């Protein structure tokens, strides 16, 4: 059972992704690595995305099938509990490789039917 209306959590995920995209606009991996404020901001938004995914509960798979929800939820635990071993390149790869399909899936789920 989700904590709240699924559309609200989906919107939180979308907003988090869009903020991350704005944070890293014009950066490459090296620029990202050299900007600890941006790294911290991105990690914070990934935590919020993870939490919103957890709040979706089973609705996540129903609303956005085919996405790696276990991994999306798990990145929050990785950032919280292994904070001293977070690899900036892994965070960057998450931004580049994983956020675009997540964003597309969330947009499809939020689109009006028809």
Segments from the language model and where they lie:
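Solvent-exposed interaction patches of small proteins and small membrane subunits
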Residues: 1-114
């Amino acid at each position: 059972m989700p904590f709240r209306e699924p559309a609200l959590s989906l919107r939180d995920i979308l907003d988090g992704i869009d903020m991350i995209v704005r944070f890293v606009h014009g950066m490459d991996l090296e620029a990202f690595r050299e900007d600890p404020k941006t790294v911290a901001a991105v990690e914070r938004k990934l935590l919020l995305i993870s939490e919103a995914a957890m709040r979706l509960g089973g609705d996540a798979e129903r609303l956005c099938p085919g996405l790696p929800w276990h991994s999306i939820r798990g990145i929050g635990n990785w950032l919280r509990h292994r904070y001293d071993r977070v690899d900036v390149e892994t965070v960057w790869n998450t931004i580049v490789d994983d956020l675009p399909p997540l964003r597309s899936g969330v947009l499809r789920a939020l689109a009006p039917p028809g």
